[in-house]
């Protein structure tokens, strides 16, 4: 079974594109803030909560402005936003600043079993909710473009003997082997962020 979210598009790109950001630190290391922008834009539409994204339309210009709003909450740093807790605190602070309490955030560490992660991904997508995902190092070079990077998951495809996830980053989407993605073969791992209902 294949499930894909009705995701946001800007200038024919799926999601926000980090390459559009003019500030050097955000252009090079703003991936956490970019995924937070994606998530807020998506939830503002889904939950009809305009204060999450206080701009009239989805455009490159408004994304750049919104990234500037998000930057103080998820400021790029030397080692990146490399712990789920930093992301949870930063985005949680932004949500509180706009009085968004319809949903809450919860992390699932990369040390969790694949089955737990698979259940989390499927349940989130089945609820029409995208997933911020952090990957640190990976032993398989085919994932090198996703190393030390935050990106979004916006779909899954269950095959007979495998499951693929739809990864969204830099305005593009790619279908990835989720079991291989999750099992990095490295000691330190990232994880994913679940978006849960408060009511």
Question: Which residue stretches match the model-derived regions?
Answer:
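Active-site-adjacent substructure of cysteine-protease-like catalytic cores
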Residues: 111-165, 198-199
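Extracellular-facing segments of soluble proteins and assemblies that are Gly/Ser/Thr-biased and enriched
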Residues: 61-117
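Non-transmembrane alpha-helical segments in soluble domains
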Residues: 40, 92-95, 122
């Amino acid at each position: 079974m294949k499930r894909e979210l009705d995701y946001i598009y800007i200038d024919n790109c799926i999601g926000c594109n980090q390459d559009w950001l003019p500030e050097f630190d955000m252009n090079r290391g703003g991936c956490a803030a970019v995924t937070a922008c994606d998530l807020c834009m998506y939830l503002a539409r889904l939950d009809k909560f305009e204060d999450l994204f206080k701009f009239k339309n989805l455009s490159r210009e408004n994304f750049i402005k919104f990234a500037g709003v998000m930057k103080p909450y998820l400021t790029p740093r030397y080692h990146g936003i490399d712990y789920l807790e930093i992301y949870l605190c930063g985005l949680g602070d932004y949500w509180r600043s706009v009085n968004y309490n319809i949903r809450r955030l919860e992390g699932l560490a990369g040390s969790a079993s694949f089955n737990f992660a698979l259940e989390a991904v499927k349940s989130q997508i089945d609820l029409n909710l995208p997933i911020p995902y952090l990957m640190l190092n990976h032993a398989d070079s085919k994932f090198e473009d996703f190393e030390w990077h935050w990106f979004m998951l916006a779909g899954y495809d269950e095959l007979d003997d495998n499951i693929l996830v739809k990864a969204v980053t830099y305005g593009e989407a790619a279908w990835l082997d989720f079991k291989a993605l999750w099992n990095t073969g490295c000691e330190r791992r990232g994880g994913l962020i679940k978006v849960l209902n408060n009511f």
